[in-house]
């Protein structure tokens, strides 16, 4: 399931700093931003209104990878 996730580092116009956008397929489900002193995660709803169901270890791996890329590690 990890290979269906995509992480994009971007510079949206509404942010001062870079963000890590996290997608499952073509649908964004989370974003990590660094606008404050600590990293902050925003979770987005599915377009169809259903709940996201993603295995816990996968979520952790994807978030850690996104954090690593965002920090340039």
Per-range role (PLM):
Residues 5-9, 28, 61:
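A general, composition-driven signal for non-globular sequence regions
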Residues 1-17:
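Negatively charged, low-complexity tracts enriched in Asp/Glu with abundant Ser/Thr
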Residues 4, 35-40, 64-69:
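Short, surface-exposed, charge-dense and proline/glycine-enriched linear segments
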Residues 10, 32-35, 57:
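Surface-exposed loop/turn and secondary-structure junction residues enriched for glycine/proline
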Residues 16-48:
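A short, structured beta-strand/loop element
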Residues 44-73:
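Mixed-charge, Lys/Arg-enriched low-complexity segments
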